[in-house]
Design a protein with these regions (language model features):
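Intrinsically disordered, low-complexity linker/terminal regions across diverse proteins
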Residues: 28, 37-40, 49-52, 59-66, ...
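Noncatalytic, helix-rich "gating/capping" subdomain that lines the substrate-entry/channel surface
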Residues: 1-160, 197
Length: 447
């Protein structure tokens, strides 16, 4: 019954490709219009119960789904809906019950990813605890394994990459002056978060575990923490955005650009070798974390980021002519990746275009920055770019990512982007006879 209800929903929810288009997420409606989507659920009561007041408007991210909500929530479908809710609830909480529950509940996801067995209990417990106390663990990790010296060094790298980007924007030959000016304003207002935050959020002071001898369980403690987290999250509704707030913990190997805040974030855990090390050459560091830094800056000007202004508001600051030029260049990037074979499947160029644009801009800008250093080695730059994308994965997992991930496969990120840069051919002696050769007129350059 749960699967039957899922089938009722599936035709009306966005695909991964549609979800990758941020512009279609913003569909503001008056609250009175929103609550009329269905007479089967009291949407007014649900929303006001969450935020404690009645909003003027609601941003509907998936309007097609809501258009069909009354067709889905019928009296005939109620038994299916009930089963679906029960299954969703059990699956979401099973990891906090017995070890047998934890292992059984992961069967479906393990099949999708090609994983043979459940994560060991001790490791799962670590991830559960570190996930719950993520900012606390991140603070410890950042101070112990990264430190102030590396933090200051990386902050200087970020500022240098921003300067390179600013110079490129000012010298850009396909943007008009009005769009250039707006782009530089956005760049000048870019927020930077490196390493770890200056303080742990006050929310974590409220997390008090009740031990087993006092009647506490893993599930009961988790539910209390979840309620506190949701209360904290909804308390921020309709208040000014705090751009200094960290959303990702410092012990996470990742980096990102937040288009709604115009902020770039580099947690301490990604600021380690091979991405970055004080023991590596400057060229290796620029081919690693330098390219990642510039990649995140590039997201401010990719097909999604370009839609938002310096404050993170959806606001078209492009002239029509410049936007058409950009869209044509983005289409060239789509075509470069679309249909590339991988893991018995093919890359979706449209799904991955924003990340591919960011990779291209990041690699190119990082190389320009590397050239200003006295110990320049373009070979080390490209070799470390390839090194940071080393990956081990089952074919089933790779096939899953082809369907849902906005990133191209790691191997293709390593090997396709360098082909767009002339220095790659000069450094490694690539000629028309080599498989990695790409004719000059086919090399994609945007930023």
């Amino acid at each position: 019954q749960a699967v039957q209800f899922d089938k009722l929903i599936a035709p009306h929810v966005k695909s991964a490709e549609e979800n990758a288009d941020y512009s279609k997420m913003y569909n503001p409606q008056s609250f009175d219009t929103f609550i009329k989507y269905t007479d089967k659920l009291d949407l007014k009561k649900l929303v006001t119960g969450l935020i404690g007041t009645t909003p003027d408007k609601v941003i509907v991210t998936d309007p097609v789904y809501f258009d069909h909500l009354n067709d889905i929530l019928t009296e005939a479908h109620f038994p299916l809906f009930k089963s679906w809710m029960i299954i969703k609830t059990v699956r979401s909480l099973s990891g906090y019950l017995s070890e047998e529950f934890r292992q059984v509940s992961g069967i479906y996801s393990r099949v999708l990813s090609g994983t043979d067995e459940a994560m060991p209990q001790k490791k799962a417990a670590y991830y559960l605890a570190s996930g719950q106390f993520d900012q606390v663990v991140g603070d410890y990790y950042g101070k112990k394994y990264f430190g102030e010296a590396a933090k200051k060094d990386v902050e200087q790298m970020v500022k240098k990459m921003i300067a390179v980007y600013k110079k490129r924007l000012e010298e850009n030959d396909w943007l008009g002056d009005a769009t250039k000016e707006k782009a530089v304003i956005k760049l000048n207002n870019l927020g930077i978060q490196v390493g770890y935050p200056d303080k742990i959020p006050a929310l974590f002071d409220q997390f008090k575990t009740v031990p087993a001898d006092q009647g506490g369980t893993l599930l009961s403690n988790t539910l209390v923490f979840s309620k506190l987290t949701l209360k904290d999250r909804f308390s921020k509704w309709n208040k000014p955005v705090d751009r200094s707030e960290w959303e990702m913990s410092a012990d996470t190997v990742n980096a990102y650009y937040h288009p709604f805040r115009n902020v770039i974030v580099f947690p301490a855990a990604i600021l380690q070798a091979p991405f970055y090390s004080l023991e590596q050459s400057s060229s290796a560091n620029y081919g690693g974390i330098g390219a990642v830094i510039a990649h995140e800056i590039s997201h401010a000007f990719d097909n999604n980021g370009a839609l938002f202004d310096e404050y993170g508001n959806l606001n078209n600051w492009w002239t029509e002519e410049d936007l058409t030029q950009f869209q044509n260049k983005a289409q060239a990037m789509i075509e470069e990746f679309d249909g590339l074979p991988f893991a018995d499947g093919k890359v979706n160029g449209k799904l991955t275009v924003s990340e591919n644009i960011a990779d291209a801009g990041g690699l190119s800008c990082a190389l320009e920055a590397a050239k200003t250093e006295s110990d320049l080695s373009i070979e080390e730059f490209f070799v470390n770019w390839a090194t940071i994308w080393r990956t081990k994965a089952k074919k089933e997992y790779q096939q899953l990512l082809l369907q849902i991930d906005v990133h191209a496969p790691a191997k293709l990120r390593a090997n396709v982007q360098p082909k767009n840069l002339d220095e790659f051919y000069e450094t490694f002696g690539i000629t028309e006879q080599d498989a990695m050769y790409l004719a000059p007129e086919k090399r994609v350059r945007i930023w």
